[in-house]
């Protein structure tokens, strides 16, 4: 079995070579963001979320921490923090799983099959059990308000042009030549 750091590198490489957009924060690969599209044929179809992923030192023996950066209305996602209540990730994680499993299986399954009996968002769980039509409407409202593809994807493009200090790296003011050139 590969060492945890080698496995982390291999899993990150697989994820980056997949169809997911991955934005790394620094070179240690312990925290990064993944652009995640809502599953087809779900209430979340058409929505786009930025998912924050943190890998513990002991990854893959310990599960990654996964959270939604932009808001999502779901019984198993904390509305304020974006933390995900996902048994497979939080309790039954196995080193046999990898990051691709998180984005191709675990998160889509969570969105397709919410579990109102184990909620992080009690209001969403209650509404799902009480009035499914109202719940579905609220999910769609959140998707339209917080998960617009053009806003999330343009935020990613903006991030690419930002330097580490948060200033726009395309700013050419510092390069401007003052005065006249010698003839």
UniProtKB/Swiss-Prot annotation:
Extent of Acidic residues compositional bias: 152-176
Catalytic activity: S-ubiquitinyl-[E1 ubiquitin-activating enzyme]-L-cysteine + [E2 ubiquitin-conjugating enzyme]-L-cysteine = [E1 ubiquitin-activating enzyme]-L-cysteine + S-ubiquitinyl-[E2 ubiquitin-conjugating enzyme]-L-cysteine
Annotated segments matching region Disordered: 148-183
Similarity comment: Belongs to the ubiquitin-conjugating enzyme family.
Pathway of action: Protein modification; protein ubiquitination
Location of the UBC core domain: 1-148
Protein name, per record: Ubiquitin-conjugating enzyme E2 6
Record-level GO BP terms: protein ubiquitination; ubiquitin-dependent protein catabolic process
Tissues/organs with expression: Expressed in roots, petals, sepals and silique walls.
Listed Pfam families: UQ_con (PF00179)
Organism: Arabidopsis thaliana (Mouse-ear cress)
Keywords: ATP-binding, Nucleotide-binding, Transferase, Ubl conjugation pathway
Catalytic-site annotation from UniProt: 85
Function recorded in the entry: Accepts the ubiquitin from the E1 complex and catalyzes its covalent attachment to other proteins.
EC number(s) reported in the record: 2.3.2.23
Description of what induces expression: By senescence, but not by heat shock.
Highest taxon, organism lineage: Eukaryota
């Amino acid at each position: 079995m590969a060492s945890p750091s080698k496995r982390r590198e291999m899993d990150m490489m697989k994820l980056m070579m997949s169809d997911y957009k991955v934005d790394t924060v620094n070179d240690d690969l312990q925290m990064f963001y993944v652009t995640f599209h809502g599953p087809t044929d779900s209430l979340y179809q058409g929505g786009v979320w930025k998912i924050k992923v943190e890998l513990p030192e002991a990854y893959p023996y310990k599960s990654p921490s996964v959270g939604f950066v932009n808001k999502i209305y779901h019984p198993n996602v904390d509305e304020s923090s974006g933390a995900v209540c996902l048994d497979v990730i939080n309790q039954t994680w196995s080193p046999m799983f990898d990051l691709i499993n998180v984005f191709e299986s675990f998160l889509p399954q969570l969105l397709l099959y919410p579990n109102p009996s184990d909620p992080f968002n009690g209001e969403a769980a209650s509404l799902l059990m009480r009035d499914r039509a109202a719940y579905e409407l609220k999910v769609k409202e959140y998707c339209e308000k917080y998960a617009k593809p053009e806003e999330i994807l343009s935020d990613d493009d903006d991030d690419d042009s930002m330097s580490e200090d948060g200033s726009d790296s395309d700013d050419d003011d510092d390069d401007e030549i003052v005065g006249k050139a010698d003839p």
